[in-house]
């Protein structure tokens, strides 16, 4: 006899799925993608965390926490600053006003 698996359809945002508000989830999603870009850049440049931290003007323990996903104490602005220090260009684009949209969104494309 086959077991029936129960599942729940995803909202499309893992942070909403685990209970964060949509606003918190949006911010956490942006931070996650920026951290992913930082990790990728450090890896591609073959930097140690100590070297990367020096470039980003922070210390290795702080950078390590961030790279492991501890995002509560870091801002999107700081993450963008780390990326630019590492040689990446961070673009911020504001789209035109749309009266049909209740609220705008934070979106990252990395």
Task: Mark where each language-model region is.
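DNA major-groove recognition helix of helix-turn-helix
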Residues: 67, 94
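Short amphipathic helical patch at the helix-1/turn junction of helix-turn-helix
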Residues: 42-44
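DNA major-groove recognition helix of helix-turn-helix/homeodomain DNA-binding modules
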Residues: 76-93
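Short alpha-helical DNA-recognition segment
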Residues: 47-64
